[in-house]
Amino acid sequence: MRKYETVFILNPALDEEGYKANVEKFKGVIENAGGTVDNVDLWGKRKLAYEVKKVSEGYYTLMNFTADTELPKELDRVFRITDTVIRHMIITQE
C-alpha cells in the first residue's frame, strides 16, 4: 500500500450539495477498491489562475489516501469521465 495525494477542481456551477456529493463519490471509489481516505480538505470556491474549459473559478479539494498501485489508474479514469471535474492531479507521497 502506498500513500497518494490528489487535488481536483469541480465546476463552479454546482451547488454546495452537488459539490459534496461529488467528493463523496470519489471517496467511495477509493474505499470500494480497498483503499482508505486519510484526509479530505475542502478548499471551497477559488479563482483559477487562467480559464479552463471557459470557466474562471472552481471548487478545489485536496484528498490524501492510501491504496494499492492500481487504484490511481481507476481514480484517474473516473475523474476523466466525470463531467463536473475541470482538472485533477494524482501524485505519490514520499
Swiss-Prot record:
Keywords: Ribonucleoprotein, Ribosomal protein, RNA-binding, rRNA-binding
Species this chain originates from: Clostridium botulinum (strain Langeland / NCTC 10281 / Type F)
Family according to the record: Belongs to the bacterial ribosomal protein bS6 family.
The protein's name in its UniProt record: Small ribosomal subunit protein bS6
SUPFAM superfamilies: Ribosomal protein S6 (SSF54995)
Coiled coil: none
Assigned GO CC terms: cytoplasm; ribonucleoprotein complex; ribosome
Function per UniProt: Binds together with bS18 to 16S ribosomal RNA.
Presence of the UniProt keyword Ribosomal protein in the record: yes
An individual GO BP term: translation
